[in-house]
Swiss-Prot record:
<keyword id="KW-0946">Virion</keyword>
<dbReference type="Pfam" id="PF03187">
    <property type="entry name" value="Corona_I"/>
</dbReference>
<comment type="similarity">
    <text>Belongs to the coronavirus I protein family.</text>
</comment>
<comment type="function">
    <text>Structural protein that is not essential for the viral replication either in tissue culture or in its natural host.</text>
</comment>
<dbReference type="InterPro" id="IPR004876">
    <property type="entry name" value="Corona_nucI"/>
</dbReference>
<dbReference type="InterPro" id="IPR044311">
    <property type="entry name" value="N2-like_embe-CoV"/>
</dbReference>
<dbReference type="GO" id="GO:0044423">
    <property type="term" value="C:virion component"/>
</dbReference>
<protein>
    <recommendedName>
        <fullName>Protein I</fullName>
    </recommendedName>
</protein>
Amino acid sequence: MASLSGPISPTNLEMFKPGVEELNPSKLLLLSNHQEGMLYPTILGSLELLSFKKERSLNLQRDKVCLLHQESQLLKLRGTGTDTTDVLLKQPMATSVNCCHDGIFTILEQDRMPKTSMAPILTESSGSLVTRLMSIPRLTFSIGTQVAMRLFRLGFRLARYSLRVTILKAQEGLLLIPDLLHAHPVEPLVQDRVVEPILATEPLPLV
C-alpha cells in the first residue's frame, strides 16, 4: 500500500475504488420522496434503468385503460388516530377489493344506484285522471239537459229540431257500443262494465 503521508495522486485513488463504476449523469436518476422538496439521488445500472423505464411505460398504459378510483377521505384518515365507525368504513372497504398489488385501483363494476319506485305516483296520477274523465260526461249531460229543457219550454222550432237529431244519434251510438267494444277493445275500465242500451222511456216531442 502506498504511503499516505504525501499528496495523493490520481493513480493512488484508483486503488481505493476497484469495483466502483464511474458516475454518469445519464445514469443519475433523481426520485422524488413523498415529502415535498426532498430529492434523493439514486444510481441505477443500465439494465435496471431499462427495466424501470419499461415498467413505468406499462403502468402509464394501464392507467389509460383502467380508471383510477379516487381514494376516499376515510382511507386517508386511517392510521392517523381519527375515530371512524364501521358503518362509514363499509363503502371504502368494499372498494379495496378492486385494488391491484401495484397499488392501482381498478373499477370492476359499480354498484347500481337504488331507483325510487314511481308506481305510487303513476297510480295516483292515473286515478286522478280517471276521476276527471268520469266527471266530464256527468257535467256535460247535466248542462245539456238543462239547456234542452229550457229550449223545449221556449218553443224554438230550430233548436228543438237540432236537439232531436242529437238525441237520436246518441241513442244510436248507445245501441252500437257493445259491437264496437268487441271490434275495438279499449281500456279495462270500460271493458269491466256491462254496457246496456239506454232506451228513451218517454217519447220525444215532435217538431
